[in-house]
Amino acid sequence: MNKDNTLHTIMKITMFSEVSVGISANSILFFAHLCMLLGENRPKPFHLYIVSLSLTQLILLITMGLIAVDMFMSWGRWDSTPCQSLIYLHRLLRGFTLCAACLLNVFWMITLSPRSSCLSKFKHNSPHHISGAFLFLCVLYMSFSSHLLVSIIATPNLTSNIFMYVTQSCSLLPMSYSRTSTFSTTIAIREAFLISLMALSSGFMVTLLWRHKKQAQHLHSTSLSSKASPERRATRTILLLMSFFVVLYILENVVFYSRMKFKDGSMFYCVQIIVSHSYATISPFVFICTEKHMTKILRSVCTRIINI
């Protein structure tokens, strides 16, 4: 029993720490890029995508914090409406995060494409096309996740093994094998498509970086080889985030299938939640640390606070 209590406490501290740190980091990233976006005469699409991604991740972590409260604290039970609304919103925001990360990769691939490339003709209209694609994918996610509005219920008082644990107040109704297979296949195809798109765009950017490095070595230019351009730094940042995202996605699926295999209702579920929200927590730190103007803003703010 003591071992279970210790694991429960560790999971609770880890989850709330992840949520609080992620909310703080995404808030800083969101407001910093929003100020840049509003302060520019010609707003850069890159700032718009970072604002969208950080806002989505911020709301996702806030929603996750509310769900975590119901998982670990007995502050009164929810009825079906809060359960359905929060779980549905949480599922949507997770899908939106994947879409935003994928489309950021695609946008940067189009931005870096040379004039001779077939992608160059999309440069001027890429923000409009990508925004339209994002809205289309959002509507698609909303329709595919709509079954949660009827599958999620308030956990009944009676003890039963037919309900799948979600939180203390919420449970998932069992579905037929055909419905489960349909939803699982649809989700797998959708996410495989988006991750494949991310992988292709990342491969394209790696090729461009390699060519740029070869050209710099050929020209024997120390200025090109010793100091990376803002485009190269941004490309490395996005590639790093892409690699991190894929690793976490694979790890999350391993934990999910372990949960299904061992029929564990809480332990593997908590680990899965922590892993699945790690990207939303860590990615803003990657952007903050790799963008020079962000570090300058934070240093100036810290200096002003210290001087006060």
Curated annotation (Swiss-Prot):
Organism superkingdom: Eukaryota
Membrane topology reported for the UniProt record: Multi-pass membrane protein
Segments on the Cytoplasmic face: 40-48, 113-132, 210-236, 289-308
UniProt keywords, alphabetically: Cell membrane, Disulfide bond, G-protein coupled receptor, Glycoprotein, Membrane, Pheromone response, Receptor, Transducer, Transmembrane, Transmembrane helix
GO MF, one annotated term: pheromone receptor activity
Protein name in the entry: Vomeronasal type-1 receptor 92
Record lineage: Eukaryota, Metazoa, Chordata, Craniata, Vertebrata
Disulfide-bond pairs as recorded: C83-C170
Native source organism of the sequence: Rattus norvegicus (Rat)
TM stretches of this protein: 19-39, 49-69, 92-112, 133-153, 189-209, 237-257, 268-288
Originating gene: Vom1r92
Similarity field: Belongs to the G-protein coupled receptor 1 family.
Subcellular location: Cell membrane
GO biological process, one term: sensory perception of chemical stimulus
Keyword check for Cell wall biogenesis/degradation: no
All ranges on the Extracellular side of the membrane: 1-18, 70-91, 154-188, 258-267
InterPro entries in UniProt: GPCR_Rhodpsn_7TM (IPR017452), Vmron_rcpt_1 (IPR004072)
Function: Putative pheromone receptor implicated in the regulation of social as well as reproductive behavior.
GO cellular-component term (any): plasma membrane
Residues bearing attached sugar chains per UniProt: N157
